[in-house]
């Protein structure tokens, strides 16, 4: 026989092997071989030793069990003939080829599949290697076969590959959808421009033919033209976005004077600046020539200036400057004295469809594309745009553009047949302002008895349109937002309120809420206008607070008809209220109920559809299992989540009873709870219980069970909501195990601190035993022997040996690692053992220890060792506190008693130490909190854990006389338990 001495390989080349030395075995080597065999069989992965020809010499136990093989079956036989490789002839041939390669001196490593699990009945993937091992002469004598189970890794890799493929498909789908969206925008924009051209062209011809502003239709023509231009701008913007998304947006470079371009664009805003009393300051050089796309440069300046004018309050300041920045760059800055832009939003404002709203400012209507377009156009020019705080407050936008076009780009000369100077633009198109609309909210004294209608709408043109539709039949006054409307209503209540939903300062739904809160206004009928087609919002408003809901766009005829109905009902209600005022009837309530009932009837189908859609969405997409059962607990319906949790398909659950999914030991309690629920003896209940899955496994869940609302005569339906908490339970179990380990480690550490005291306690009886043994020997050695004295010496030896044995028994019991087992605790023995353990440390620290216990103590169930550990931890803390504080009175009192009702054991650990501050008390039981220079701060946290395991409580009190008193309450328990 010989043993193997491994040496580290000297060469990590292709021929990678170990050198070995052969020695004769002695007894020491045999022992080492036995140890090696134990380690070899204890290895978790596949390990085998082959001779140079690939015949099996040794294989570890794990590999043998995985393949369902015994070593005697394969020892001395070719490795590739073993059961592991009998998946197919190809697998066997591959393994034979690998062995031949390794036998030639080459290290082999690859991933293979073998029959390596469930006794050779299951295929697993293995990271397999063959390492040639040579002797001192360089001859190959062994092949070391090693394998690591990578089945889970392979599955994960396959799943990852599948997910990556799905992700690639999703990305491709998104790309196609994005292209389709851009194509759709482009086509729709082109299609819309044709009818818009046919609106604007004839309109301009009609306006040119009319007799100027004296024409009775001039105002309507202006409204049509202004809104058609606004729509055309939005269509052009969408078309630009589609081109940019399709990377079809190019630049038409031209040598131009940026100063002249900027000056001309800025001049279009001077009228608006004067109208709003805004100081508009421009600082431009005489000339700055650059190669830019003039049209896109104009759009950049227009959008930045319109943005500044939107947010700058009346009397504010706006600056537009142009200057050189670094070599070959133009810097455009636009600053305002508005509310500014918070740093957190400075990236978002350049995103598409993002609108920044500022409370108290004029409405910022629009598409939210202005700054996005600016950023896109700037980046097309290879420039940059940024926003920061303006000096003195407000926003400061800075645009940097290169003065020269990229090398190779075509640049048109300033004499090319395009306009040399930018055209004058209509700034209303960019600011979305209607002229002369500032004083619309002013209310003139009403001169007639016509019903009053208040219109609340932030769009001036829409306000004017509604006012024109109704002014012939009603006294109409208007407000631009909810706050102004509320102020007007308080002074002059209308007979009808017509309000838009989305407005600045105060929205329409907030206005409705405020109106309904005021008793003097609560009877006013309300009509809501909205461009948002939201069925759920519509149902909510109609059912709770408003009388009508009208979607934009609407016809003048429909508006008049609806207004007439609501005003007629209001006038009739007022007349009835006046007629019946002496009878004390509240006709307003009756009228409100009548209107409310009518609208409930009208909207019932819509509400039902919305409710069913919400329920279906919750039912099908909820992560919790939802099951409907009949009174016999047979399954009527189960949602996909429940099917996924239990592994049953929809067809599997047809006719199945929930009892069949319930473990037999839980079935009686489940039946009783359901019976109580059906008989009215119990309300809705929740319980933690287990379920049997289709594959035979068990899951844990929180089950909430209740009765569904039912009509008279209908059979009851039970709703069960199941929340899978299997992983949570496993995590809790792992946490409990960790807590048990922590408690044991703490117990060991405590006993380590007691080592000196225990040695002292054992040394005393051992010394007495030696003394009495010597004395007994002398008494027996006398002539004649003194038998009585010798017997007394032996009795003392027995007494002292019993004392030493009791101390050792107590230490072994305290250090024993075991699961928490709840059983009756011998409290007298517990008190005695604890007193014995604490005797030495209290004496060594000059602390007077008193242990007081009632004659009759409640019987408690628990883990005696853990309760003892809890008491010792508290007592040692007290001894240490007394010693470090150098107290005059050094007293520690342990007391054991029943509480007032006799249903709990109360343990008190009271000391005369320095006490505990209020700040310390708040963190006292937190893990890792300590007031000591040394220590982990885990002692009291472990005490809390032990108390909670026993369903008890622990708290601390500070007596007026000083010191600290820790109290532990452990409930008494009837019956038996584990």
UniProtKB/Swiss-Prot annotation:
Function: Member of the two-component regulatory system TodS/TodT involved in the regulation of toluene degradation. Phosphorylates TodT via a four-step phosphorelay in response to toluene.
Keyword Calcium: no
4Fe-4S found in the keyword field: no
Superkingdom of the organism of origin: Bacteria
Signal sequence extent: none
Single GO term (MF): phosphorelay sensor kinase activity
InterPro entries from the UniProt entry: CheY-like_superfamily (IPR011006), HATPase_C_sf (IPR036890), His_kinase_dom (IPR005467), HisK_dim/P_dom (IPR003661), HisK_dim/P_sf (IPR036097), PAC (IPR001610), PAS (IPR000014), PAS-assoc_C (IPR000700)
E.C. designation(s): 2.7.13.3
Enzyme class, UniProt record, top EC level: transferase
Chief subcellular location: cytoplasm
Protein name: Sensor histidine kinase TodS
Residue ranges of every copy of the Response regulatory domain listed in the record: 452-567
UniProt note: phenotype after gene disruption: Mutants are unable to use toluene as the sole carbon source, are incapable of converting indole to indigo and do not have catechol dioxygenase activity.
Organism of provenance: Pseudomonas putida (strain ATCC 700007 / DSM 6899 / JCM 31910 / BCRC 17059 / LMG 24140 / F1)
Record's subcellular location: Cytoplasm
Limits of the Histidine kinase domain: 187-405, 757-974
Boundaries of every PAS domain copy: 32-103, 611-681
Modified-residue entries (4-aspartylphosphate), positions: 500
């Amino acid at each position: 026989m010989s043993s193997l001495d491994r040496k580290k390989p000297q060469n990590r080349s292709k021929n990678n092997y170990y050198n070995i030395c052969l020695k004769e075995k002695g007894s020491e080597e045999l022992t080492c071989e036995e140890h090696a065999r134990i380690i070899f069989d204890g290895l978790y992965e596949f390990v085998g030793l082959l001779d140079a020809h690939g015949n099996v010499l040794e294989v570890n136990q794990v590999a043998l069990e995985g393949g369902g093989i015994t070593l005697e079956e394969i020892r001395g036989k070719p490795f590739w003939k073993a059961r592991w490789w009998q998946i197919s002839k190809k697998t066997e041939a591959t393994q034979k080829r690998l062995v031949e390669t390794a036998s030639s001196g080459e290290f082999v490593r690859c991933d293979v599949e073998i029959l390596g699990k469930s006794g050779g009945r299951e295929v697993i993937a293995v990271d397999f290697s063959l390492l040639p091992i040579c002797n001192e002469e360089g001859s190959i004598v062994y092949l070391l076969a090693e394998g690591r189970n990578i089945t889970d890794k392979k599955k994960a890799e396959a799943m990852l590959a599948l997910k990556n493929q799905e992700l690639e498909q999703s990305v491709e789908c998104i790309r196609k959808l994005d292209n389709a969206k851009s194509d759709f925008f482009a086509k729709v924009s082109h299609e819309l421009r044709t009818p818009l051209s046919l609106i604007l062209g004839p309109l301009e011809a009609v306006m040119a033919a009319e007799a100027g502003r004296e024409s009775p239709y001039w105002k309507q023509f202006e409204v049509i033209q202004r809104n058609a231009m606004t729509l055309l701008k939005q269509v052009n913007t969408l078309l630009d976005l589609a081109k940019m998304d399709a990377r079809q947006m190019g630049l038409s470079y031209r040598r131009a004077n940026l100063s002249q371009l900027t000056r001309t664009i800025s001049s279009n805003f001077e009228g608006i600046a004067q109208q709003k009393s805004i100081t508009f300051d421009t600082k431009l050089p005489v000339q700055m020539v650059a190669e830019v796309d003039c049209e896109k440069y104009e759009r950049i300046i227009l959008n930045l200036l319109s943005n500044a004018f939107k947010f700058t309050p009346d009397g504010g300041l706006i600056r537009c400057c142009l200057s050189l920045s670094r070599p070959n760059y133009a810097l455009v800055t636009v600053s305002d004295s508005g509310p500014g832009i918070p740093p957190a939003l400075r990236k978002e404002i350049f995103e598409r469809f993002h609108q920044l709203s500022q409370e108290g400012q004029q409405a910022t209507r629009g598409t939210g594309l202005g700054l996005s377009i600016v950023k896109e156009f700037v980046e097309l020019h290879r420039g940059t745009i940024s926003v920061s705080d303006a000096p003195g407050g407000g926003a400061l936008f800075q645009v940097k553009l290169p003065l020269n076009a990229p090398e190779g780009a075509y640049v048109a000369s300033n004499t090319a047949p395009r306009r040399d100077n930018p055209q004058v633009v209509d700034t209303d198109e960019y600011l979305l302002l209607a002229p002369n609309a500032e004083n619309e909210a002013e209310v003139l004294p009403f001169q007639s008895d016509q019903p009053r209608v208040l219109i609340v709408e932030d769009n001036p043109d829409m306000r004017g349109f509604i006012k024109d539709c109704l002014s012939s039949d009603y006294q109409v006054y208007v407000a631009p937002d909810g706050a102004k409307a509320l102020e007007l209503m308080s002074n002059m209540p209308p007979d009808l309120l017509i309000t838009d939903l989305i407005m600045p300062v105060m929205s329409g739904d907030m206005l409705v809420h405020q109106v309904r809160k005021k008793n003097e206004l609560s009877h006013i009928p309300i009509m809501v206008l909205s461009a948002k087609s939201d069925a759920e919002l519509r149902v909510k408003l109609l059912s709770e607070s408003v009388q009508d809901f009208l979607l934009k766009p609407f016809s003048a005829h429909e508006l008049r008809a609806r207004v007439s109905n609501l005003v007629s009902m209001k006038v009739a209600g007022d007349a009835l209220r006046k007629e019946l005022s002496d009878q004390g009837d509240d006709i307003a309530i009756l009228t409100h109920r009548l209107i409310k009932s009518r609208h409930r009837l009208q909207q019932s189908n819509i509400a039902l559809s919305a409710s069913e859609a919400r329920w279906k969405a919750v039912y099908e997409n909820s992560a919790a299992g939802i099951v409907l059962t009949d009174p016999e607990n047979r399954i009527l319906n189960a949602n996909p989540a429940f099917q996924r949790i239990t592994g049953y398909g929809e067809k599997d659950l047809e006719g199945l009873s929930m009892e069949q999914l319930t473990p037999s030991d839980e079935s009686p309690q489940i039946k009783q709870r359901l019976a109580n629920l059906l008989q009215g003896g119990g309300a809705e209940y929740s319980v933690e219980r287990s379920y049997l899955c289709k594959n035979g496994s068990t899951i844990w869940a929180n089950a909430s069970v209740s009765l569904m609302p039912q009509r008279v005569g209908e059979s009851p339906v039970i709703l069960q909501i199941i929340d899978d908490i299997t992983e949570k339970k496993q995590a809790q179990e792992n946490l409990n195990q960790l807590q048990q380990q922590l408690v044991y480690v703490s117990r060991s550490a405590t006993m380590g601190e007691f080592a000196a005291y225990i040695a002292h306690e054992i040394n005393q009886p051992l010394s007495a035993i030696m003394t009495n043994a010597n004395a007994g020997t002398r008494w027996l050695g006398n002539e004649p022997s003194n038998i009585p004295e010798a017997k007394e010496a032996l009795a003392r030896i027995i007494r002292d040996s019993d004392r030493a044995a009791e101390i050792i028994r107590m230490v072994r019991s305290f250090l024993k690692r075991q699961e928490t087992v709840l059983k009756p605790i011998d409290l007298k023995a517990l008190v005695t053992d604890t007193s014995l353990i604490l005797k030495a440390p209290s004496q060594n620290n000059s602390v007077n220890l008193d242990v007081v216990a009632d004659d009759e103590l409640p019987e408690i169930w628990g883990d005696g060792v853990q309760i003892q550990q809890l008491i010792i931890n508290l007592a040692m803390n007290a001894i240490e506190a007394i010693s470090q504080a150098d107290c005059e009175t050094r007293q520690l009192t342990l007391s054991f008693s029943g509480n007032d009702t006799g249903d709990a054991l109360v343990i008190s650990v009271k000391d005369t130490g320095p006490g505990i501050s209020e700040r310390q008390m708040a963190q006292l039981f937190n893990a890792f909190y300590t007031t000591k220079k040394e220590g982990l701060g885990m002692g009291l946290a472990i005490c809390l854990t032990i108390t909670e395991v026993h369903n008890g409580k622990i708290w601390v009190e500070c007596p007026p006389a000083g010191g600290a008193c820790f109290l532990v309450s452990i409930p008494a328990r009837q019956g038996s338990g584990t």
